[in-house]
């Protein structure tokens, strides 16, 4: 989906609009219900995430707590990502893997705020070693050929 910063009655919030683009390598069912199910699953595990504040099922929108700060990707680009971020990611993996889960480890999905690494997406999938942090995600959490290629492809080099 697409996420937008908006002003709620008590301050900033994030509004996520579900979208339905075709995806050749992944089959989605009901994306809104999947997002809600994943939120409940990850919340039950205790993953630090923004709270879900509201759901508009008719418009397929989620309203989430705003988590301030730069994403891990932005911190990688400026050289300001502290080592504790990757240590916290590995601690999250110790919660996820025994539960049979992976999340989207791409660094745009994480914000280090108040010393805590927050997963700002709600997506999770059944565990598959080829997509876990060590085999896939960590390739994008440092100055690697994969990250440089992604940045160039997205005009962020």
Predicted regions and their residues:
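Protein kinase-like catalytic core scaffold
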Residues: 13, 48, 62, 118-120
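C-lobe/activation-segment region of protein kinase-like
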Residues: 97-102, 112-157
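Conserved structural core of kinase catalytic domains
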Residues: 28, 47-86
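Conserved kinase catalytic-core segment
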Residues: 82-110, 115
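Generic beta-strand structural signal
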Residues: 8, 55-57, 105, 112
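Structural motif at the C-terminus of the N-lobe alphaC helix and the adjacent alphaC-beta4 loop
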Residues: 37-48
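Short, glycine/acidic-enriched loop or turn micro-motifs at the edges of active sites
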Residues: 68, 107, 124
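ATP-binding glycine-rich loop module of kinase domains
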Residues: 1-33
């Amino acid at each position: 989906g697409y996420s937008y910063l908006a002003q709620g009655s008590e301050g900033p919030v994030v509004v996520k609009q579900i979208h339905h683009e075709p995806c050749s390598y992944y089959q989605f069912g009901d994306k809104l219900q999947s997002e809600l199910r994943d939120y409940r699953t990850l919340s039950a595990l205790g993953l630090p995430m923004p709270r879900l504040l509201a759901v508009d099922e008719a418009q397929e929108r989620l309203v989430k707590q705003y988590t301030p700060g730069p994403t891990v990707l932005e911190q990688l680009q400026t050289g300001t990502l502290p080592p504790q971020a990757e240590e916290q990611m590995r601690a999250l993996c110790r919660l996820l893997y025994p539960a049979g889960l992976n999340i989207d480890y791409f660094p745009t999905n994480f914000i280090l705020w108040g010393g805590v690494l927050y997963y700002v997406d709600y997506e999770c999938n059944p565990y598959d070693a080829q997509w876990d942090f060590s085999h896939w995600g960590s390739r994008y959490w440092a100055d690697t050929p994969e990250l440089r290629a992604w940045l160039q492809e997205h005009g962020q080099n």
